[in-house]
């Protein structure tokens, strides 16, 4: 048990976890400092959750056309978001297992680094570029696509899947792969890679890594995975106040984060997002605010009973949402992950 005289120190220590926000007036300088403080906090959280000690450096600039592909993909992902926390999407660009020594052997290898023994694969998608001669472009044609395993000795293995696609020219097509088969490739039954057969007029029009040096034309494997046992629904932030109509009380305000402006061009999408921030004065029994029922709040009530003028409440987020990021990791691989705690949804005083 502690004496009443030690109460202010104890309360100060309890306030430290809420150091993301601090009481300040509507001073522009103070508000800018708060924005910088929260931005730095969010940057550190992103790095921590992506298992990075620092932002990747020395990465090759992404081809603008390839970046457009990922941005379009990001928009599609948001539209059909399953509202699952813990889901990670990873993209693997095909490699030549012979490293150019045997260009006549068409095979695509994918270096999957995910621990698939401890994860469930939700979806496996192979994206392939098909190259149609200019003379045949503009005319709708059916192309039958077949995906085969290539055994470790280089021999042709089993057919994995097939499909028929209507095309008017060169384009990228996506075909779903059997989840159990894909998981076995990277766990119990390793293969050399895959071979794609897309026949048109007696010619295979599917591009393999031996036939192109452009990332945008190369094959890509997209895996959606979730650690076993994790599932959680998301919700959305609702701003309460704005800069033009500021509240004197604790309130939620916009905070736009632009990744290129903070020097983080390794974040591919979104280019910017609203993280929101909590700020404003907290007064006990203020007419515009209900204090959070926490142990901290009870101690603060005790502080008010001893009428200590130096003790105040801290305005801080009480609910958060995640953000989906497409980013380039240290190895130069493009991945997608949901990063928790990136959007403040609701404010409280304690």
From Swiss-Prot:
Any coiled-coil regions, as ranges: none
SMART domains given in the database record: TGFB
Tissues in which the UniProt entry reports expression: Expressed in the chemosensory neurons, including in the ASJ neurons in males. Expressed in the ASI neurons.
Concerning PROSITE patterns, the annotation shows: TGF_BETA_1, TGF_BETA_2
Q: Which residues are glycosylated?
A: 23
What's the reported outcome of changing residue 280 to R? In M70; loss of function
**Any keyword Signal?**
yes
Any one GO MF annotation of this record:
growth factor activity
Main subcellular location of this protein, as a coarse class: secreted
Offer one example of a GO biological process linked to this entry. cellular response to pheromone
An example GO CC term for this entry is: extracellular space
Briefly describe its induction: Dauer-inducing pheromone inhibits its expression and promotes dauer formation, whereas food reactivates its expression and promotes recovery from the dauer state.
List cystine links.
241-251, 250-315, 278-347, 282-349
Residue ranges annotated as propeptide in the record: 22-234
Among InterPro entries, the record links this protein to: Cystine-knot_cytokine, TGF-b_C, TGF-beta, TGF-beta-rel, TGFb_CS
Write out the similarity annotation: Belongs to the TGF-beta family.
Q: What does this protein do?
A: Under harsh environmental conditions, larvae enter a developmentally arrested state known as dauer; TGF-beta-like daf-7 acts to inhibit dauer larva formation and promote growth. May be a ligand to cell surface receptor daf-4. May act as a negative regulator of dauer larva development by transducing chemosensory information from ASI neurons. Involved in sensitivity to CO2 levels. Involved in mate searching behavior of males, acting in concert with the neuropeptide pdf-1. In AWC neurons, acts to promote expression of srsx-3, a member of the GPCR family.
State the PANTHER family in the record: DAUER LARVA DEVELOPMENT REGULATORY GROWTH FACTOR DAF-7, TGF-BETA FAMILY
What is the protein named? Answer: Dauer larva development regulatory growth factor daf-7
Could you tell me the gene encoding this protein? daf-7
